[in-house]
Amino acid sequence: MTKLIIHLVSDSSVQTAKYAANSALAQFTSIKPKLYHWPMIRNLELLNEVLSKIESKHGIVLYTIADQELRKTLTKFCYELKIPCISIIGKIIKEMSVFSDIEIEKEQNFNYKFDKTYFDTLNAIDYAIRHDDGQMLNELPEADIILIGPSRTSKTPTSVFLAYNGLKAANIPYVYNCPFPDFIEKDIDQLVVGLVINPNRLIEIREARLNLLQINENKSYTDFNIIQKECLEVRKICEQRNWPVIDVSTRSIEETAALIMRIYYNRKNKYNK
């Protein structure tokens, strides 16, 4: 494995640089990365501390810094060390300015923008928490997305991830031999997505959960036949109603959420034509 040092430098949380780095690293199977996070770098004193670390640990520098003087100092320093220094959004900002014929604003304001997007995200997170695991079904019409699936198919973390992207997601568990909420018999506008998983994989996850909780008596929870029937029934429910189904057996939460968002926005764009 080839070791690669990456410095993530930001005047905010470094999440943008981190996502960009991880997306790029996903293209390489033979690289073992070491990421150094340098958030909230907003003055020269803090930047100089980072520069000394970069000097002692040479590697690629990815940055998102708004202040022009700080950017110049960082890029000049890296140029002299002959190491790559890449602005994650610099090219995007420049192209936006050129295309819109609007100059980039010189004044920097580090106060977070409490705009509509921010409050929509807070509301979506609150909604996901209150409508987890089949709670408050009477408020399902407020959801953007409804997830259904057997227990431990990542419905809750996927709902929260969707919420961080501003989408209100409710989730409802399917339990073998238990009546499913009657909302499935109604015509609903929300996107409903079924989550299923390989039964053997789900057994592993559920057994780990029971061991963590020190529970040894719930045999039906890890019974292969019951788990298989739960997944088959979820598929059947979704197929009868033309609802999409996603197999999460080998998918990360981020990947599952991304697929759901693609379906959601494709559907939304279709209706908005």
Curated annotation (Swiss-Prot):
Entry superkingdom: Bacteria
InterPro entries per record: Kinase-pyrophosphorylase (IPR005177), P-loop_NTPase (IPR027417), PPDK_reg (IPR026565)
Catalyzed reaction equations: N(tele)-phospho-L-histidyl/L-threonyl-[pyruvate, phosphate dikinase] + ADP = N(tele)-phospho-L-histidyl/O-phospho-L-threonyl-[pyruvate, phosphate dikinase] + AMP + H(+); N(tele)-phospho-L-histidyl/O-phospho-L-threonyl-[pyruvate, phosphate dikinase] + phosphate + H(+) = N(tele)-phospho-L-histidyl/L-threonyl-[pyruvate, phosphate dikinase] + diphosphate
Pfam families: Kinase-PPPase
Enzyme class at the top of the EC tree: transferase
UniProt keyword annotations, A-Z: Kinase, Nucleotide-binding, Serine/threonine-protein kinase, Transferase
Molecular function terms from GO: ADP binding; ATP binding; phosphotransferase activity, phosphate group as acceptor; protein serine/threonine kinase activity
Membrane-spanning segments: none
E.C. number(s) listed in UniProt: 2.7.11.32, 2.7.4.27
Binding site for ADP: 149-156
Job description of the protein: Bifunctional serine/threonine kinase and phosphorylase involved in the regulation of the pyruvate, phosphate dikinase (PPDK) by catalyzing its phosphorylation/dephosphorylation.
HAMAP family reported for this sequence: PDRP
Family: Belongs to the pyruvate, phosphate/water dikinase regulatory protein family. PDRP subfamily.
The protein's name in its UniProt record: Putative pyruvate, phosphate dikinase regulatory protein
Organism lineage string: Bacteria, Pseudomonadati, Pseudomonadota, Alphaproteobacteria, Rickettsiales
